[in-house]
From Swiss-Prot:
Belongs to the ENY2 family. It is found in: Nucleus, Nucleoplasm; Cytoplasm. This is Enhancer of yellow 2 transcription factor. Gene3D superfamilies: 1.10.246.140. Coiled coil: none annotated. Component of the nuclear pore complex (NPC)-associated AMEX complex (anchoring and mRNA export complex), composed of at least e(y)2 and xmas-2. Component of the SAGA transcription coactivator-HAT complexes, at least composed of Ada2b, e(y)2, Pcaf/Gcn5, Taf10 and Nipped-A/Trrap. Within the SAGA complex, e(y)2, Sgf11, and not/nonstop form an additional subcomplex of SAGA called the DUB module (deubiquitination module). Component of the THO complex, composed of at least e(y)2, HPR1, THO2, THOC5, THOC6 and THOC7. Interacts with e(y)1. Interacts with su(Hw) (via zinc fingers). One of its GO terms (molecular function) is transcription coactivator activity. InterPro entries: TF_ENY2, TF_EnY2_sf. Involved in mRNA export coupled transcription activation by association with both the AMEX and the SAGA complexes. The SAGA complex is a multiprotein complex that activates transcription by remodeling chromatin and mediating histone acetylation and deubiquitination. Within the SAGA complex, participates in a subcomplex that specifically deubiquitinates histone H2B. The SAGA complex is recruited to specific gene promoters by activators, where it is required for transcription. Required for nuclear receptor-mediated transactivation. PANTHER family: ENHANCER OF YELLOW 2 TRANSCRIPTION FACTOR. It holds the Pfam family EnY2.
Protein backbone atom coordinates (compact mmCIF):
# COMPACT_ATOMS: atom_id res chain seq x y z
CA UNK A 1 0.00 0.00 0.00
CA UNK A 2 1.42 3.40 -0.95
CA UNK A 3 1.74 6.34 1.42
CA UNK A 4 -0.94 8.15 -0.55
CA UNK A 5 -3.34 5.23 -0.19
CA UNK A 6 -2.57 4.92 3.52
CA UNK A 7 -3.23 8.62 4.13
CA UNK A 8 -6.38 8.44 2.04
CA UNK A 9 -7.64 5.40 3.95
CA UNK A 10 -6.84 6.95 7.33
CA UNK A 11 -8.59 10.24 6.55
CA UNK A 12 -11.69 8.37 5.39
CA UNK A 13 -11.78 6.20 8.51
CA UNK A 14 -11.14 9.08 10.91
CA UNK A 15 -13.75 11.31 9.31
CA UNK A 16 -11.16 13.96 8.47
CA UNK A 17 -11.51 13.51 4.73
CA UNK A 18 -14.70 15.57 4.59
CA UNK A 19 -13.02 18.33 6.63
CA UNK A 20 -10.09 18.38 4.21
CA UNK A 21 -12.42 18.44 1.20
CA UNK A 22 -14.43 21.30 2.73
CA UNK A 23 -11.25 23.26 3.40
CA UNK A 24 -10.06 22.67 -0.16
CA UNK A 25 -13.39 23.77 -1.67
CA UNK A 26 -13.45 26.91 0.46
CA UNK A 27 -9.88 27.88 -0.37
CA UNK A 28 -10.34 27.26 -4.10
CA UNK A 29 -13.47 29.41 -4.10
CA UNK A 30 -11.79 32.18 -2.09
CA UNK A 31 -8.82 32.42 -4.45
CA UNK A 32 -10.97 32.46 -7.60
CA UNK A 33 -9.79 29.08 -8.88
CA UNK A 34 -13.32 27.79 -9.45
CA UNK A 35 -14.16 30.82 -11.57
CA UNK A 36 -10.96 30.35 -13.59
CA UNK A 37 -11.76 26.69 -14.25
CA UNK A 38 -15.35 27.51 -15.18
CA UNK A 39 -14.05 30.07 -17.69
CA UNK A 40 -11.52 27.55 -19.00
CA UNK A 41 -14.34 25.05 -19.58
CA UNK A 42 -16.42 27.63 -21.41
CA UNK A 43 -13.51 28.60 -23.64
CA UNK A 44 -12.78 24.98 -24.53
CA UNK A 45 -16.45 24.33 -25.28
CA UNK A 46 -16.65 27.36 -27.55
CA UNK A 47 -13.38 26.47 -29.26
CA UNK A 48 -13.97 22.75 -29.76
CA UNK A 49 -17.69 22.25 -29.61
CA UNK A 50 -18.60 23.88 -32.90
CA UNK A 51 -19.71 20.48 -34.13
CA UNK A 52 -21.19 19.35 -30.76
CA UNK A 53 -18.85 16.36 -30.58
CA UNK A 54 -17.07 17.10 -27.29
CA UNK A 55 -18.15 14.69 -24.55
CA UNK A 56 -18.03 15.41 -20.83
CA UNK A 57 -15.20 12.89 -20.50
CA UNK A 58 -13.18 14.67 -23.20
CA UNK A 59 -13.76 18.04 -21.53
CA UNK A 60 -12.64 16.66 -18.17
CA UNK A 61 -9.55 15.07 -19.74
CA UNK A 62 -8.57 18.39 -21.29
CA UNK A 63 -9.38 20.64 -18.34
CA UNK A 64 -7.96 18.55 -15.47
CA UNK A 65 -4.22 19.02 -16.16
CA UNK A 66 -4.68 22.75 -16.73
CA UNK A 67 -6.88 23.13 -13.65
CA UNK A 68 -4.33 21.38 -11.46
CA UNK A 69 -1.62 23.81 -12.50
CA UNK A 70 -3.90 26.71 -11.56
CA UNK A 71 -4.19 25.63 -7.90
CA UNK A 72 -2.19 28.23 -5.93
CA UNK A 73 0.88 27.00 -4.06
CA UNK A 74 -0.47 28.54 -0.85
CA UNK A 75 -3.54 26.29 -1.05
CA UNK A 76 -1.41 23.21 -1.70
CA UNK A 77 0.86 24.05 1.25
CA UNK A 78 -2.07 24.68 3.59
CA UNK A 79 -3.65 21.33 2.72
CA UNK A 80 -0.36 19.50 3.11
CA UNK A 81 0.12 21.08 6.54
CA UNK A 82 -3.43 20.10 7.54
CA UNK A 83 -2.83 16.49 6.48
CA UNK A 84 0.48 16.39 8.35
CA UNK A 85 -1.23 17.76 11.46
CA UNK A 86 -3.93 15.09 11.25
CA UNK A 87 -1.32 12.35 10.85
CA UNK A 88 0.78 13.75 13.72
CA UNK A 89 -2.28 13.75 15.98
CA UNK A 90 -2.86 10.13 15.01
CA UNK A 91 0.74 9.29 15.92
CA UNK A 92 0.25 10.97 19.30
CA UNK A 93 -2.88 8.93 19.98
CA UNK A 94 -1.08 5.62 19.42
Amino acid sequence: MTVSNTVDQYTIMSGDRSKIKDLLCNRLTECGWRDEVRLLCRNILVEKNGNNSLSVEQLIAEVTPKARTLVPDAVKKELLMKIRTILAENEGDN
